[in-house]
Amino acid sequence: NVGLVLDTGHFMNTNPDLETEADGAEYICAMAEKLGSMKKLFRGMHLSCSLSGKYQKSCAAVPPENMDGETVMMHITSIDQHRPFTTEAARKIVECIEPAYLTHELFGDYGEISEEKLKIQLAAIGAYGSGGKSVFLCG
């Protein structure tokens, strides 16, 4: 029994030219299709949106010498944003990958799980109040 977990936000961060959720969905699905029959190995997915390309491009190649913990965390969260998808791009990704397990990897301002962000993303995939695909949540 072998399976992989796709983290959509992390994968989106590998392409700083992505500007929209639709760009991200296209990028993710193109990668999955290139895998051919190996695509079925994606058993789980951490779903979140991260469009941090502008920030990544603005960063200096060499980090400052004196970086405290707060600065490091601000840098990390500026790249790995854990935002909810708000458009049909989320549904496109879920339908393309077809994960058995879907984790909504969304964080509030203080690291807590944000119920509001969860509702936004569930609506984007069509699973909130519409009888859509079963969704498994991990906290």
What are these regions (language model features)?
Residues V2-G139:
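Histidine-acidic metal/acid-base catalytic patches
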